[in-house]
Amino acid sequence: MSETVTVDSMKPQQIERETRRTQLNRGELAERIARAVPRDGRAEPLKGLRLLRVSSPTEQVHSVSDPAFCVIAQGSKEVLLGDDRYQYDPMHYLLATAELPIVSHVIEASQERPYLSLSVKLDPTLVGSVMVEAGHVSPRSHADVRAINVSPLDASLLDAVVRLVRLLDTPAEASFLAPLITREIVYRLLVGEQGGRLRNIAVQDSHTHRITRAVEQLRKELDQPLRIDDIARELGMSVSSVPADR
C-alpha cells in the first residue's frame, strides 16, 4: 500500500519535471534558431535542415510542399491545402508527406518575438530504412491519405529536435551525429500519431506516392492541354484522385 502511495505521489513531480523540461527546450530552440538566423530570411545550416525567421505576419504565399517535418519555436502559421486549413504553433508539429501545391502564411510574428521555425526534409529512402530496422510493416490501407496534418509535439520528439539544432555549434560533430538524430526523429514520427501517413512515403505504390507522381507529370506538361483522363490511366488512379485546379 505504501509503495503505491509513493508511486502516485511522484506522478505530479514527474509531470512537473516533464513540463519544465519542455519549456526549457522550447526556449532553447527559439534562442538557437534566432542566433542562427539573426535577420529575416531562410538558412540551411545542415543538409536537409531549414530554418526560417519572419518579424511580421505575412500575406498568403503559394508554394509546393516537400515531404518534411516542420516545427515552430515561436509564433504560429497556417497552411492551406485545397479546402483544408492547418494551423500550428510551438505545441504542435506539421508533417507533409507529399509534394503538392499549398498556400501558407505566418499568423503570429513581431520584431520583439519573431516567427522562428525549422523543417527537416524527409527522404523516402531514409524512412524506409528506419521502418525496416524498427520492424514496421508497410501500411495495408490508405485510411488517412492526407498529404498534410498537424499533431501535438511531445517531449521526446522536441528533445530530439533541440539536440539536432545544438549541432550547429559543433560542425565537426554535426557531419556524424546529424544523420543519427534525424533517424531518431523519423523513428519517433513513425511510432507517433502520424506514423501511418509517414510510412506511406516509403511505399512506391502508395496513394500519396501516386499523387506526387501525378503532380510531377502535370508540371512537366504545363505547356500542353490538360488531359486528366490520360494522367489517371497512366498512374493507375481514378480521375477524381488526380489533383488539378479545375
Where do the PLM segments sit?
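A short, N-terminal "cap"/entry segment at the start of jelly-roll beta-barrel domains
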Residues: 1-45, 50-52, 58-60, 140-146
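Long, charge-rich low-complexity segments
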Residues: 3-7, 13-17, 117-122, 225-244
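N-terminal regulatory/effector-sensing and dimerization cores
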Residues: 41-138
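Residue-level marker of regulatory loop/turn positions in helix-turn-helix DNA-binding domains and
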Residues: 61, 174, 178, 203, ...
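Localized chelating/binding microdomains
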Residues: 61, 93, 214, 221, ...
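Basic/polar phosphate-binding segments, predominantly the helix-turn-helix DNA-binding elements
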Residues: 184, 188-194, 204, 219-221, ...
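Short alpha-helical elements of helix-turn-helix
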Residues: 208-212, 240
